[in-house]
Amino acid sequence: MPVKDSSSNKKNQIGKLSERQRRILEVITDAVSLRGYPPSIREIGDAAGLQSTSSVAYQLKELEKKGYLRRDPNKPRAVDVRALPDPIPSKPGRKPGPKKSSVAISPDPAETSPTSFVPIVGSIAAGNPILAEENVDGYFPFPSEIVGDGDLFMLQVEGESMRDAGILHHDWVVVRSQPVAEQGEFVAALIEGEATVKEFHSDSSGVWLLPHNDAFDPIPAEHAEIMGKVVSILRKL
């Protein structure tokens, strides 16, 4: 039985890219080179002419299958470009442009401090991972000494229920993902598909999510899903 040349097959497979897939690779490598972290799903879609996040997710999976990308299943937005396709052959009479480099430009360590790129989460659906691709709108850089470590994400506060605690309408909160909370901690919780920020409280009468505004009532939390603990607040003045 003849033995197939697997390396030759792989080479043929890795060359089969559409123009759109080439564009997606360019967008990712350019973003990593310029700012040190990959673009969001929506940024990729805008640059590649894809309207839906599911279409972008599909193209990323195809690029991963073809060996151009490697993705960390535990970090939905971690994307590592493994290879770049050969340049598209130029038309007769034209010189090919310079070949792009896939090497990311590293900032001078002396001018930088440890930074956490925190995903900005838009709408959250019950039962879906918080950091699922379709939930993340982008990233925001924070000094690690401010937000700490762990799996972090950002939510924008809607409403005045935490006003007296200094958490105002349209503030951004940085949340460390964890399924449990301690007494008195501010948490982000999911109730009937809606995210809310409240104080966690437990006593003989049950578990409650407490507002910090007398105009709002405590919320029973028996059926709430604790998404994490609020660790920082960001406000635009």
UniProtKB/Swiss-Prot annotation:
Active site: S161 (for autocatalytic cleavage activity), K198 (for autocatalytic cleavage activity)
Record carries keyword Glycosyltransferase: no
Enzyme Commission number(s) from the entry: 3.4.21.88
Record feature DNA-binding region, as residue ranges: 41-61
Keyword Transcription on entry: yes
GO molecular function, one term: serine-type endopeptidase activity
Site (Cleavage): A126, G127
Catalyzed chemical reaction(s): Hydrolysis of Ala-|-Gly bond in repressor LexA
Record field: compositional bias (Polar residues): 1-12
Biased composition (Basic and acidic residues): 67-80
Enzymatic class: hydrolase
Function (record text): Represses a number of genes involved in the response to DNA damage (SOS response), including recA and lexA. In the presence of single-stranded DNA, RecA interacts with LexA causing an autocatalytic cleavage which disrupts the DNA-binding part of LexA, leading to derepression of the SOS regulon and eventually DNA repair.
Subunit structure: Homodimer.
Protein name: LexA repressor
Protein's organism: Corynebacterium diphtheriae (strain ATCC 700971 / NCTC 13129 / Biotype gravis)
